Swiss-Prot record:
It is found in: Plastid, Chloroplast thylakoid membrane. InterPro entries: PSII_PsbK (IPR003687), PSII_PsbK_sf (IPR037270). Its main location: plastid. The keyword Transmembrane applies. The lineage of its organism: Eukaryota, Viridiplantae, Streptophyta, Embryophyta, Tracheophyta. Residues 1-24 form a propeptide. One of its GO terms (cellular component) is chloroplast thylakoid membrane. Keywords: Chloroplast, Membrane, Photosynthesis, Photosystem II, Plastid, Reaction center, Thylakoid, Transmembrane, Transmembrane helix. PSII is composed of 1 copy each of membrane proteins PsbA, PsbB, PsbC, PsbD, PsbE, PsbF, PsbH, PsbI, PsbJ, PsbK, PsbL, PsbM, PsbT, PsbX, PsbY, PsbZ, Psb30/Ycf12, at least 3 peripheral proteins of the oxygen-evolving complex and a large number of cofactors. It forms dimeric complexes. The gene is psbK. The chain crosses the membrane at residues 40-60. This is Photosystem II reaction center protein K.
Length: 61
């Protein structure tokens, strides 16, 4: 139980403190990569959804 509580606290703290990363800007030399960097956090969610599509394709065996 303590481990789960600790994990939840760590996750909440990382969410609260990582909000400063969203307002960070790339260096000027990498400014052309801004659209790609904006999409990158969504990629793990797409893999998660792909797992459900795959399981639906094989009838949730």
């Amino acid at each position: 139980m303590l481990n789960i509580f600790s994990l939840i606290c760590i996750c909440l703290n990382s969410v609260l403190y990582s909000s400063s990363f969203f307002v960070a800007k790339l260096p000027e030399a990498y400014a052309f990569l801004n659209p790609i960097v904006d999409v990158m956090p969504v990629i793990p969610v797409l893999f998660f959804l792909l797992a459900f599509v795959w399981q639906a394709a094989v009838s949730f065996r």
